[in-house]
Amino acid sequence: MARNEVRPVIKLRSTAGTGYTYVTRKNRRNDPDRMVLRKYDPVARRHVDFREER
């Protein structure tokens, strides 16, 4: 079905350089560009930007 095409699984990698990642899904129709979310990085022990990695 179209489930895999509309809401793919993506990795969000920390920009702090710790290598920590979150795994989530996104809607390609609403967010066609690469996602950037501000989330908690437990390795750096602070909130940092997480960028989508393909």
UniProtKB/Swiss-Prot annotation:
Entries under Pfam families matching the protein: Ribosomal_L33
GO BP annotation list: translation
Domain of life from the UniProt record: Bacteria
InterPro entries to which the protein is assigned, alphabetical: Ribosomal_bL33, Ribosomal_bL33_CS, Ribosomal_bL33_sf, Ribosomal_zn-bd
Signal peptide stretch: none
Oxidoreductase among keywords: no
Molecular functions (GO terms): structural constituent of ribosome
Record key words, sorted: Ribonucleoprotein, Ribosomal protein
A Gene Ontology cellular-component term: cytosolic large ribosomal subunit
PROSITE patterns recorded: RIBOSOMAL_L33 (PS00582)
Family (UniProt): Belongs to the bacterial ribosomal protein bL33 family.
Stored NCBIfam families: PRK00595.1, rpmG_bact
UniProt-recorded name of the protein: Large ribosomal subunit protein bL33A
